[in-house]
């Protein structure tokens, strides 16, 4: 399995699709199908039935998964979208690096 370029908690921007230009925080990543759920992006309305536990039915808004190829990480230094690379530090740790500025991405 490849190293994760986008992780939970990262700030990302959508680069293509109906939500192009939207920014948000990654809520979850699904490595099996290469998708991520981003807060406030790709929101769909879902109709739910009431259940026996007392939960109300109705229309709820839910964030839908977006393919990772449609997302770019926001550079922590410049605030602009950037590609992600990897670097091995002197202490042997492998860290993510913003390609545009060379800044280490925490997370």
From Swiss-Prot:
* Classification via Pfam families: KOW, ribosomal_L24
User: Could you tell me the keywords of this UniProt record?
Assistant: Ribonucleoprotein, Ribosomal protein, RNA-binding, rRNA-binding
CDD domains from the UniProt entry: KOW_RPL26
The domain of life for this entry's organism is: Bacteria
Whom does it interact with, and what assembly results? Part of the 50S ribosomal subunit.
Q: What does this protein do?
A: One of two assembly initiator proteins, it binds directly to the 5'-end of the 23S rRNA, where it nucleates assembly of the 50S subunit.
The name this protein carries in UniProt is Large ribosomal subunit protein uL24
From the broadest rank down, the organism's phylogenetic lineage runs: Bacteria, Pseudomonadati, Pseudomonadota, Alphaproteobacteria, Acetobacterales
């Amino acid at each position: 399995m490849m190293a994760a370029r986008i992780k939970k908690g990262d700030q990302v921007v959508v680069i293509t699709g109906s939500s192009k230009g939207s920014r948000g925080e990654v809520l979850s990543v699904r490595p099996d199908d290469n998708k991520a759920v981003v807060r406030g992006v790709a929101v769909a309305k879902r109709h739910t039935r009431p259940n026996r536990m007392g939960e109300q039915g109705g229309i709820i808004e839910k964030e839908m998964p977006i393919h990772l190829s449609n997302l770019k990480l926001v550079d922590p230094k410049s605030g602009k979208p950037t590609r992600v690379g990897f670097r091995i530090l002197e202490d042997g740790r492998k860290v993510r690096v913003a390609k545009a500025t060379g800044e280490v991405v925490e997370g």
